């Protein structure tokens, strides 16, 4: 897993070492941010169900001003902290351990220019 574009292009990110967390693929992130283009620059972003933090880190790499990561799994929160520190982005983000609905109840939606959600999905 790596950062696809922007100032951190090519930077490797740490991946989960446990089952159940499926990071957003590099290809999907590349497609998403190619569509968004320059609209990411100078924005405040919510990365909900943040998992590894890869989506929010990609936004920061491409010029987002600030990202709020929301994740309820404590292992994933630790992984986000590790990835953010590895990318030297701690001053440009906030990391909250909470379920997304609870976190949204405490943060005005107007606080964000862009909301990115990649919730977990069931597997059979």
Model regions: which residues?
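Class I S-adenosyl-L-methionine-dependent methyltransferase catalytic core
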Residues: 1-124
């Amino acid at each position: 897993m790596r950062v696809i574009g922007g100032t951190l292009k090519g930077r490797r990110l740490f991946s989960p070492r446990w089952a159940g967390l499926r990071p957003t693929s590099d290809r999907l992130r590349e497609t998403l941010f190619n569509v968004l283009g320059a609209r990411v620059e100078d924005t405040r972003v919510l990365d909900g169900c943040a998992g590894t933090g890869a989506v929010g880190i990609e936004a920061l790499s491409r010029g987002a001003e600030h990202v709020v990561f929301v994740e309820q799994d404590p292992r994933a929160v630790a992984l986000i902290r590790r990835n953010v520190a590895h990318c030297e982005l701690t001053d440009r983000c906030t990391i909250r351990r909470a379920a997304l609905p609870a976190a949204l109840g405490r943060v005005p939606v107007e606080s964000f220019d862009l909301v990115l959600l990649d919730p977990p999905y069931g597997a059979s």
